[in-house]
């Protein structure tokens, strides 16, 4: 198998795992391949960001920016199957309602959403929508560029946790168990290239603010996960992606306020 073919298969493996988008039938799947596919998680963000940006630019031709933002968010949620939003809600439930490590992990594994998860999910969606609507005041293209930058960067944030932290679930049936192996330095560099490259679409001040805010959110999340759990779970990765995505939007907004 050629190296290029193998890398393409890994990308499609990541795309099939993290989205509901169809992938070619010839792409094989295995836990080992999913683990190695982690390097392409930010590249999946390129696809999701492009879907969101294209949807927004299409909807805003017919509708007010606020409605266009909501509809574009609905499209990206549909494309990903609310994969990361589910992780955010589970993390909110577990960290909000659990007193010790075991209880937090047990609550996070429960498929039912609780009060913390509901409140956290609603607030997250409202915050992202509000941030994007505010960005629309600076031009519709600004919203599209923010989406193109935030989705890859936030997935790089999640990927960095796989490299720096321990996976803490012992359940072999856990959906994210194949991600338990730490990324190599080379794999992290590949992920970083795909995660950081879209920042070039932004003005320098915006890119710096987005990167700073995202890094701060990721470090804070990692500290919370380490203190409460001693590592990360799949839900933690989803929560980190959601929090980092919001942080990216807020960083861009902050840059606009000081330009």
From Swiss-Prot:
It catalyses: alpha-ribazole + adenosylcob(III)inamide-GDP = adenosylcob(III)alamin + GMP + H(+); alpha-ribazole 5'-phosphate + adenosylcob(III)inamide-GDP = adenosylcob(III)alamin 5'-phosphate + GMP + H(+). Keywords: Cell inner membrane, Cell membrane, Cobalamin biosynthesis, Magnesium, Membrane, Transferase, Transmembrane, Transmembrane helix. Pathway: Cofactor biosynthesis; adenosylcobalamin biosynthesis; adenosylcobalamin from cob(II)yrinate a,c-diamide: step 7/7. Its main location: membrane. It is an enzyme of class 2 (transferase). Its EC number is 2.7.8.26. HAMAP family: CobS (MF_00719). Belongs to the CobS family. This is Adenosylcobinamide-GDP ribazoletransferase. It comes from Aromatoleum aromaticum (strain DSM 19018 / LMG 30748 / EbN1) (Azoarcus sp. (strain EbN1)).
């Amino acid at each position: 198998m050629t190296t290029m073919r193998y890398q393409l298969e890994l990308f499609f493996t990541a795309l099939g795992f993290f989205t509901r988008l169809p992938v070619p039938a010839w792409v094989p799947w295995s836990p080992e391949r999913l683990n190695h596919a982690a390097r392409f998680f930010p590249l999946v963000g390129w696809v999701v960001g492009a879907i969101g940006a294209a949807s927004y630019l299409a909807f805003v031709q017919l509708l007010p920016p606020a409605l266009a933002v909501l509809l574009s968010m609905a499209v990206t949620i549909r494309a990903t199957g609310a994969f990361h939003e589910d992780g955010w809600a589970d993390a909110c439930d577990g960290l909000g309602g659990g007193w010790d490590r075991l209880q937090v992990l047990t609550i996070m594994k429960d498929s039912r959403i609780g009060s913390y998860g509901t409140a956290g999910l609603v607030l997250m969606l409202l915050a992202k929508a509000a941030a994007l609507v505010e960005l629309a005041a600076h031009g519709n293209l600004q919203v599209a560029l923010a989406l193109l930058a935030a989705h890859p960067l936030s997935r790089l944030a999640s990927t960095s946790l796989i490299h720096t932290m321990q996976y803490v679930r012992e359940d072999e049936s856990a959906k994210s168990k194949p991600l338990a192996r730490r990324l190599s330095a080379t794999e992290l560099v590949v992920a970083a290239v795909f995660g950081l490259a879209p920042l070039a679409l932004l003005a320098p001040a915006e890119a710096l603010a987005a990167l700073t805010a995202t890094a701060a959110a990721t470090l804070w999340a990692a500290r919370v996960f380490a203190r409460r759990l001693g590592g990360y779970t799949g839900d933690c990765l989803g929560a980190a992606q959601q929090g980092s995505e919001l942080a990216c939007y807020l960083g861009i907004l902050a840059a606009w306020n000081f330009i």
